[in-house]
């Protein structure tokens, strides 16, 4: 492993460790997402406690903190395997942030951003898969799970040299969604539309962790 690759992985982890949800909520006076809603510091929980605009802002920053380090590594000539490990490092930072006591989100938006430098066509397919699944089912978590399952096959078709690291990244995302998978199986998972309705009601949100 080159010093450049190692350095970019460290930078990616530190970028991922900057929790957009926690910082945005603190700056704008919204409740701490770790203590309200599902307790998950991610865009979907911010949707619940802060509304669409707040969630969209957090989503954009979560995507960028995965995208920028990987693009930087790509520009520096890092090989495909270590590009993939850089992407994983960014997601690990989001999931286990060193700046926030290693309590982070589930890494879906950051993973999407990290995959973006591989190709915009692939990014479009991943986004379309998530959107289609959510529109058909109403479950944000199911969209993430389906996208993670199918991502290695998309990558194998477009850029096969990245298949192995993306498969590892998909496994990480699926592991973070094991509670959601169990609730989906039991029919206990809440739909994304419910979060919008609960935002209009007093703070009696359910505590089931989503995206």
From Swiss-Prot:
Keywords, A to Z, come to: Cell inner membrane, Cell membrane, Lipid biosynthesis, Lipid metabolism, Membrane, Phospholipid biosynthesis, Phospholipid metabolism, Transferase, Transmembrane, Transmembrane helix
Q: Which InterPro entries match?
A: G3P_acylTferase_PlsY
Q: Name one GO cellular component term.
A: plasma membrane
Q: Name one GO biological process term.
A: phospholipid biosynthetic process
- EC assignment: the record states 2.3.1.275
Q: What does this protein do?
A: Catalyzes the transfer of an acyl group from acyl-phosphate (acyl-PO(4)) to glycerol-3-phosphate (G3P) to form lysophosphatidic acid (LPA). This enzyme utilizes acyl-phosphate as fatty acyl donor, but not acyl-CoA or acyl-ACP.
Q: What protein name does the entry list? A: Glycerol-3-phosphate acyltransferase
């Amino acid at each position: 492993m080159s010093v450049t690759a190692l350095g970019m992985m460290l930078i990616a982890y530190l970028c991922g460790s900057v929790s957009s949800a926690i910082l945005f909520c603190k700056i704008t006076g919204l409740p701490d997402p770790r203590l309200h809603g599902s307790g998950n510091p991610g865009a979907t929980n911010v949707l619940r406690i802060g509304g669409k605009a707040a969630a969209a802002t957090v989503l954009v920053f979560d995507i960028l903190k995965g995208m920028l380090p990987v693009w930087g590594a790509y520009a520096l000539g890092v090989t495909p395997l270590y590009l993939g490990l850089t992407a994983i490092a960014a997601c690990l930072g989001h999931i286990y942030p060193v700046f926030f006591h290693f309590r982070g989100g589930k890494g879906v938006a950051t993973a999407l951003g990290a995959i973006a430098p591989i190709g915009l066509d692939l990014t479009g397919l991943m986004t379309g898969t998530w959107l289609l699944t959510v529109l058909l089912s109403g479950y944000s978590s199911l969209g993430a799970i389906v996208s993670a399952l199918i991502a290695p096959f998309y990558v194998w078709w477009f850029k096969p040299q990245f298949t192995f690291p993306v498969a590892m990244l998909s496994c990480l995302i699926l592991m973070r969604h094991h509670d959601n998978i169990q609730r989906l199986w039991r029919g206990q998972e809440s739909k994304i539309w419910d979060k919008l309705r609960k935002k209009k009601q007093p703070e009696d949100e359910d505590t089931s962790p989503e995206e």
